[in-house]
């Protein structure tokens, strides 16, 4: 079975059209509260000194801010002149369809421009998954299943195209970074990883997994080159934001501040996880005492460290093969969402692409991916409630139902962990690869 490239291009274009159509329907308040004001601030005053001017709100790394500024600039230089031209035609040509002007002047238009980078990142992510799947299996049906499941995933579309969040930007860079490690293009991989970290800090959780890959697959010379190159990438991307009075360490100190300063202190910031299950979804700080001096924050951090260490130990024993990399990232990111405090509803998204890639090992994992997509989509909807649907809204506010789906998702984690530990040896992998679907 050959993959028809023209058909692939058709579906990619179709997924883009779908995303831009969805993006025009609505958007979350973050665009008005943060993204647009940041972009306007940059266009008015320039990049230099941005973090000092917006010290209380600016919690995104520079690459995303650059995207916001470019998107707003395109809105002003491309959209507004066309809008003025259409308005002129509407005023001076009696037969001109005025409804076209109303559509063009939709209040969501500027938000659609701001969502542009996220929308294209969705496609970049899907193509990265397609390339990795091609390394994992020769089964074209599985490869296409993975591609189409990424292109038309409702949770990803909801997050990027409707909500307007940027989580797929760092995720796309991460996926391609993993791909280039196994294509032995190590310096390209480190650049992409750095660009992902400079988009949003959420992929930082996989750094321990990447560190083992770095140690095994990079030669001594490449390790030195990669370290220097990483420092250069951070320095260059932060450079436009540096003011004259900033020192040479501005990029690294600012990023460290962004990674540690901001964030809620809630047990669960609307995430359907163990803390949401045990405690009320009300805003409860994670600093209260559970036992002695043990707080939920300390306990969750200990659990995350123990889980990550155990996964890394098995990962190392399994010789760091690509399949084990996918397993490890799936487990580390899913556990972080389910058991750490201060998680937002969006923080399960990094798990979905890697859980989807497990389908290239055995198609049974695809059903777990479908459930995780359903679970994540409901969690996103519960936090926003748009577009309004009383039945779905009532489901997401029903404690019994929500507790049930949380328990199922936690059980899914342990199912995947079980297969990772017991069945993910080299022999079992080779025997089980996509055996349920034949070319």
Regions found by a protein language model. Give the residues of each.
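Perimembrane helix-loop-helix junctions
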Residues: 1, 183, 205-232, 242-246
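Start-transfer (signal-anchor) and selected internal transmembrane alpha helices
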Residues: 1-21, 26, 134-135, 143-145, ...
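Aromatic/glycine/proline-enriched transmembrane-helix motif characteristic
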Residues: 15, 135, 247, 259-338, ...
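Transmembrane helical bundles and short interhelical boundary loops of multi-pass, membrane-embedded
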Residues: 23, 243, 252-263, 267, ...
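Extracytosolic helix-loop segments that constitute the early lumenal/periplasmic catalytic or substrate-binding loops
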Residues: 33-66, 70-87, 246-256
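Transmembrane-helix motifs of polytopic, lipid-linked glycan transferases
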Residues: 90-104, 108-137, 176, 306-315
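Specific aromatic-rich, kink-prone transmembrane helix
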Residues: 127-131, 156, 169-186, 354-355
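Membrane-interface alpha helices of multi-pass inner-membrane proteins
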Residues: 147, 157-158, 174-180, 187-212, ...
């Amino acid at each position: 079975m050959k993959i028809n490239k023209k058909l692939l291009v058709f579906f990619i274009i179709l997924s883009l059209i779908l995303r831009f159509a969805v993006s025009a329907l609505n958007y979350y308040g973050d665009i008005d509260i943060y993204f647009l004001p940041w972009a306007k601030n940059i266009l008015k005053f320039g990049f230099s000194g941005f973090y000092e001017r917006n010290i209380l709100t600016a919690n995104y790394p520079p690459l995303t801010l650059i995207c916001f500024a470019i998107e707003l600039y395109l809105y002003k230089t491309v959209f507004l002149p066309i809008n003025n031209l259409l308005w002129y035609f509407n005023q001076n040509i009696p037969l001109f369809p005025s409804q076209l002007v109303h559509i063009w002047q939709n209040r969501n238009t500027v938000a659609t421009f701001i969502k542009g980078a996220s929308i294209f990142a969705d496609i970049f992510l899907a193509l990265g998954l397609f390339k990795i799947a091609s390394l994992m299996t020769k089964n074209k049906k599985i490869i296409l299943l993975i591609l189409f499941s990424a292109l038309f995933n409702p949770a990803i579309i909801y997050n990027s195209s409707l909500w307007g969040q940027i989580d797929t930007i760092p995720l796309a860079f991460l996926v391609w970074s993993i791909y280039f490690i196994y294509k032995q293009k190590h310096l390209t991989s480190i650049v992409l990883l750095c660009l992902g970290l400079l988009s949003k800090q959420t992929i930082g959780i996989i750094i321990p997994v990447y560190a083992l890959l770095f140690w095994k697959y990079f030669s001594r010379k490449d390790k030195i080159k990669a370290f220097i190159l990483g420092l250069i990438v951070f320095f260059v991307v932060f450079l436009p934001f540096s003011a004259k009075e900033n020192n040479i360490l501005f990029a690294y100190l600012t990023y460290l501040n962004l990674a540690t300063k901001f964030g809620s202190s809630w047990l669960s910031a609307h995430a359907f996880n163990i803390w949401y299950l045990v405690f009320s979804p009300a805003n409860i700080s994670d600093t209260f005492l559970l036992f002695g001096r043990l707080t939920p924050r300390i306990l969750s951090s200990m659990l995350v460290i123990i889980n990550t260490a155990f996964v890394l130990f098995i990962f190392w024993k399994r010789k760091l093969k690509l399949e084990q990399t996918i397993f490890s990232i799936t487990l580390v990111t899913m556990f972080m969402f389910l058991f750490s405090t201060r998680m937002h509803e969006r923080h399960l998204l990094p798990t979905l692409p890697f859980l989807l890639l497990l389908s290239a090992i055995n198609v049974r994992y695809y059903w777990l991916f479908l459930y995780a997509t359903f679970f994540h989509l409901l969690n996103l909807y519960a936090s926003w409630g748009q577009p309004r649907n009383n039945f779905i809204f009532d489901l997401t506010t029903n404690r019994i139902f929500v507790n049930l789906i949380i328990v199922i998702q936690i059980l899914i984690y342990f199912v995947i962990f079980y297969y990772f530990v017991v069945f993910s040896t080299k022999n079992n992998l080779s025997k089980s690869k996509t055996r349920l679907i034949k070319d």
